From Swiss-Prot:
Chief subcellular location: plastid
InterPro entries registered for this protein in UniProt: Cyt_c_assembly (IPR002541), Cyt_c_biogenesis_CcsA (IPR017562), Cyt_c_biogenesis_CcsA/CcmC (IPR045062)
One Pfam family here: Cytochrom_C_asm
Encoding gene (name): ccsA
Protein name as annotated: Cytochrome c biogenesis protein CcsA
Amino acid sequence: MIFITLEHILAHISFSLISVVTLAYWGTLVHQIEGLSSSGGKGMIVTFVCTTGLLITRWLYSGHLPLSNLYESFMFLSWSSSVIHIILEVRSQKDRGLGAITAPSTMLTHGFATSGLPKEMQQSAMLVPALQSHWLMMHVSMILLSYATLLCGSLSSIAFLIITFRRNRRILSLLSARDNSFIWPFPSRNNLYLHEQEKSDLQNTFYLSFTNHRKCKLTQQLDYWSYRVIGLGFLLLTIGILSGAVWANEAWGSRWSWDPKETWALITWIIFAIYLHTRVNKGWQDENPAIIASLGSFIVWICYLGVDLLGIGLHSYGWLI
């Protein structure tokens, strides 16, 4: 009873903290307050500690690694996102753009686990005999870590596409406005108005140049880290699939059975393999790999939740709805 109460307290504290942290990172994108960004980083560390304590507490009273149902997998996914956030904070020298992506991911997965799932699915239960294996920790943890990593990299690619599209559209609209302007050679009231319009366009050009420099730097950082994070996620997914094949061979005598989860895991692996191939292909650069990564985020969610929506297969946690 004490462990269950402690788990609920840690769940509420961690969700409250990550909600405040998300608002802090979004605020830094608008106002660029350095202290706010630093507070967000510290808040994420406290969130990580609370979520770690929650998982350890559940491990102690359940007697097994908390990866046996949908609630536990979502909490582990949220924990993984916080780990990725902290690593990126250190490696990217506290870049605000990345924090504004990883913090909401942590908040949404945590919130869905605690508030979106029915209480029956949040209860801990004994493991079925097939799951009572040392491969549970290796296989499931690697798969969930890969999901969190691939989603983080894919969301960075989506943000890269959005910023690039809006920047290009603004440049085209300004150039179109300037090309359509015509200065009448004789002095008139309209002529003075057009000169004022040209002056305004010039001011907009300077402002656009400044903002484009910031956006260009941000898109470069998003593209840089998206590539590296997805590369790590691809490696983790490969390890997870291989360890699952070994476990399946020990449990059922078959390494691959084309279970729905296995099939979608293979599709996910192929999509991100194509993404990594396009990154080394000079003919496919800029937005093209980002589009593939964006598709990959959709595929990851199908792989993760699709089986539960169908309610079939050996990997199903049961009906989600």
